[in-house]
Structure formats: structure tokens, C-alpha cells
Amino acid sequence: MAVTGVSSAFGRLFKQDKTHKRVIGTGTKLTVTRQILEHLEGGNVSKAVSVLFASPEPVSYWLYERLFRSCSSKALVVQARKVQSHLVTFSPLPPIFLLNRAIEAYGKCGCVDDARELFEEMPERDGGSWNAVITACAQNGVSDEVFRMFRRMNRDGVRATETSFAGVLKSCGLILDLRLLRQLHCAVVKYGYSGNVDLETSIVDVYGKCRVMSDARRVFDEIVNPSDVSWNVIVRRYLEMGFNDEAVVMFFKMLELNVRPLNHTVSSVMLACSRSLALEVGKVIHAIAVKLSVVADTVVSTSVFDMYVKCDRLESARRVFDQTRSKDLKSWTSAMSGYAMSGLTREARELFDLMPERNIVSWNAMLGGYVHAHEWDEALDFLTLMRQEIENIDNVTLVWILNVCSGISDVQMGKQAHGFIYRHGYDTNVIVANALLDMYGKCGTLQSANIWFRQMSELRDEVSWNALLTGVARVGRSEQALSFFEGMQVEAKPSKYTLATLLAGCANIPALNLGKAIHGFLIRDGYKIDVVIRGAMVDMYSKCRCFDYAIEVFKEAATRDLILWNSIIRGCCRNGRSKEVFELFMLLENEGVKPDHVTFLGILQACIREGHVELGFQYFSSMSTKYHISPQVEHYDCMIELYCKYGCLHQLEEFLLLMPFDPPMQMLTRINDACQRYRWSKLGAWAAKRLMNDHYLQPP
């Protein structure tokens, strides 16, 4: 395509630099070429470009191309500009393919403006020029320019190639425009590129990012010979959507076809097993990771460790960690953090104390573990140790400190932290600012909360409004909370996350009027009430003793996940309608939903209220035998309460012999009280003696 105004164009961009210093003498072109190649082969691109720039004569076109590619691979934009300058100095009308390489180099170097300017100044362009500038814009996230260039290319009658579509699809994956994606998909088919595996894989990837897994799977199934990348993409997108079962199935299919999974894919599938507590599947994937020799990878070994921790196989988890050959600081921190975030603070602290070196991330992870476990005394002791051992803290440390202040309701300590935050400039960090607001709200100092909320006017976001609203509602000021909620709607439209968080806050307070106002707002503003919000609404109405409303919200759900089922089951127990729990559990099973430990906690509580002793033991036994769920302390506590409440002390004695741990104080107190009530002296004497001693005694 010819472009007029060639002279003016070259005058602006293709600046001919005729001041190249002759520092290499008057050697021949062959000598210059040899020197450049020697530097390139030695990996010194800058010296190679310096030799070129000092040369008073041009080199071969193939050498210019190689220099552009070398600048691209090392992201050397200054050197790329020098190569272009030398090229146009000695070649007033450079060949198009070399200018295309220059555009590619600028794109790889992150200088998309240089790439676009060079493209506009080109006297002639071909399809490669369009591909180069579209790819450069896509690589640098300039999505609007990608689509503008693509439309302009079509208007100019240039046929889009696979490379053009690849760049446009990459940008579509950034903006997640489903309508545009469908148009591009149709265009790919129309242009006859539907057999291109890379393009089809990109389409699968973007459909997955747009959360339309049905279309992603359909396109994947249409790929005649999916590549390794195709398989890894579909597995990862399933995992990101939470479709863990489908992801695991596809993972094993790719293994059957001898497709090697990426390390990241292995770790992601392992994390899916962690989320669903699928121990046996996790063990198989662990064995596969060993066979593929990827278990030494830090990301993979950390995910294996995390799976065993989540599935309560602490010995296996520790074995994985101990067998990791090259344990760096990141490995130690990841393992320790895995324990800490799972509530296993004792095990986490053991690893922390063994760490050969620590950084602020390690300290923060341990402190965060204490905060998550609500172990406030340990957190305070650890803060004292931090003050002695390290000099500098960061914004994460401050957030945990403010959480500790909230947990122990120590507003004076919180104000001291506020002073430190102000003096060191952390008050401009929105996360720290929100944690500070949350601390004032949870400590009940609403005046300080209101003052700080007004001061952070330029910082505040949805989290800020959440903290203020829940803080006001927590002290029973529902009318003020409603007023703030109206103010929030003026400043920013609340997201589903915000509304779900507010509903959860209303449930915990409880604040029925505010909860109803949020429900009404959802309906009036046309929000799609998904399972997350619906679950929060059911929980809110249940805890606010409006269970009929909770039932209606539950029945209106088109689909019900486990969280929603657990909410309604707990609500039945809380509102004196325990008989309905057993019917709900049957419906849950009929819908193919797998119960978890929370579900069984609700069922056992219903058995306590209804006096179903034998049925309670059947449900308790089925946890491990039928559903492969390891009973937790809370489930054992429910069974002991069930036996004690209805005087089934003979069964209680048998049950105690099966318990895998020493009964804590609360259980022993309940057993002792029941034995006194029902005159069961032998077991009562054992419980009383156990309460008075620190060592373990076998039940009689």
C-alpha cells in the first residue's frame, strides 16, 4: 500500500543520523559484520549495536534483522532505536520486513508508542506490518488500540491472518468482552482458521476467562489434535471456575493421552483436592508428580503439602516437606504458612522456630496464623518477639496488629498503632486505613470510626463502607446504619461482594431492618441474586428469627450449592424446626450435593434437639464410612451431649473408648454432670478425677 508524503514522514521519524563516529577505522563491511556477530554470539547485544552505530557504512539486511530480534529478546529499546537510526541513515527506503521487525522489537520492549508511530510513518505496509503493530498493542495491554487497528485493517482490505487474530484474542482476554469474543470466534471460522490449534486454544482460554465453560468445553472438543497447551488451559479454567471434579477428570484424560501437564497445572489440581478434601485423589496426583519428577518444584511441593494439611494428614505433610531437597526461604515460609492458615498454629510455630532464616513475610505469616485462629494471647507474645527480633515492619504487619486490637477490644492499643501509622505514612494505604476503621468499629468507638471515615474520603472504597456499616449496626443503631447505606449508594454502587458482606454482618449482630433494606435494594436495582447472596440472606433471616423469610428465599433458588444447604439446615436448628433437617438432608442427597462437616454438625444438633440417639450415632458413623469425612472435635462433642442429655451413659462409655483424642475440659464437665444426674458413679468418678488431673486416664 503506497502512502503519500514520504519525505515529510521520513523527516519526522526516520531521522538520518550522519554523525556516526568512525571509531572502528576504515575496515570493510565484512570486518564490521564479523565483530557484530562475535558480540551477538557472546550475548553482548549492546556492544554489537555500538559497533554497528559506529560504522560509516550499512550492513546486510539479514544482520539488521538479527539485531532487531536480539534487541527484542533482551528488551533493549535504546539499542533497537540505534539499529533503526543506522538502517534509515544508509537506506532511505528500508524494506518493509525490517521495519516490521523494528515494530516487533518496540512491542517486546514495552514501547508501544514507538511501535505505533513507526507503523504510521511507514511509506508502505504489508500484512506483517499490521500483525506486528496489533501484536505490540496486545502485548502491552492497549486493548482499545488493538481493536481499532483490527477494524482499520479490515476497512483497508487487508486480510487478517492467524497472527492478527491471536493478538486480538489476547486483548479480548484482558477486557473479557463475551459479545466481542463470539464475533471473533465467528470470524476465525469464516476466515478458515478453525483448524489452527493455537487460535482454538486461545478461544477456549478466553471463553473460560469469561466464565462460559460450556462454550469453552465445546470449542475444546472440536479441536482435532489438542496440544499440550490446550489440555493445560482447559484444566486450569475448570479449576478457576471451581469445577474441581471436571478439572480432575480432564487432568487424568490428558495423562492417558501421554500429555505432560505443566507444573502449574499439577499444583492447581492438587489445590482442587485440598479444597474438596479429596485425599485419595490427592495421593494419586502426588504419585504422578513424583513420577514426572516435578515434585521438587517449590510450587508443586507446596501444593502437595497443603493438600495433606487440609486433609488432616499432618505426618504425610511433614514428610513431604522434609523430603524436599532444596528448601529455600520461600519453601519454609510456604510450609509454615500452610500450617498457620489451616489453624495449626502449634505445628506452624514449630517450623517457624526451625527456619534457618526469616524475612518479614515469614513473621507476618506466623502472626496471621495466630490472628486467624483467634489466639490473641499468643499473638501478643509473638508481637513482643517481633519487636525484639526485627527492626522494620510493613503494611501487612500493621493490618494484623489492628486485627489483634479488634480481637481483644483494646482501643488504646489501636490508637497507639494509629499514631505509628500516621507518623510513618501508612495512613495512605487503603488496606491499612480500612483495617483501622474496622478496628474502631469492632471496639465500639463509633466517634473515632466516623472521624477516621471522613478523613479517608479520597481513599475509601466498598470495604470502608462495609466496616462503617457493620460497626454502626453492631451497636444496635439500625437507623443510622440505614442512613449510611443510603449514603453509600450515592457515592458508589455496592457490589455483590459488598452486599453479601453486609448481609453477613446483619446476621451476626443481628440487624433485621438493615438486612431487609439490603434485600429490598437488591430487588429494586435488579441485582441477580446468586447463590452467595442467597446464602447470606438465608443466614441473615435465620439468625434474625424470621425463618419463614429464610425458607422462601431458599425455595426461590434455581440452583443450590452446599453453602446454601448448610445455611438452611443450621437455620432449622436455630429456629426450633429441627424435624425439617432430616427431610432437607434427603433432598440434599437427591440433588447430588455432597455434605461436609458443617452439614453433619447441623444434623447432629437436630438429633440432640429431637432426642434421636441411635439416629445420631448412625449419622456420625456414616461421616467416615459413607462420606469419607473425618469427624472433628465438634462432632464428638455433639455425640457426647446427645448421650449425656438423654442418659445413654452405657453407650457413652463405649463411645469414649473409640475417641481418638483426650476429652477436653468442656466434654469432661458435661460427662461429670450427666453422671451425677443419672447416678452413674463409675464413669462419673473417672470424669471427676480426670478434671482434677493433668494426665490421661482410660475410661472405665
Swiss-Prot record:
GO molecular function: RNA binding
Gene that encodes the chain: PCMP-A5
Family: Belongs to the PPR family. PCMP-A subfamily.
GO BP term, example: RNA modification
Origin species: Arabidopsis thaliana
Per-repeat ranges for PPR: 95-125, 126-160, 161-195, 196-226, 227-261, 262-296, 297-327, 328-362, 363-389, 394-428, 429-459, 461-495, 497-529, 530-560, 561-595, 596-626, 632-662
Keywords: Repeat
Coiled-coil ranges per UniProt: none
Pfam family, one: PPR_2
Top-level taxon: Eukaryota
UniProt name for this protein: Pentatricopeptide repeat-containing protein At3g26540
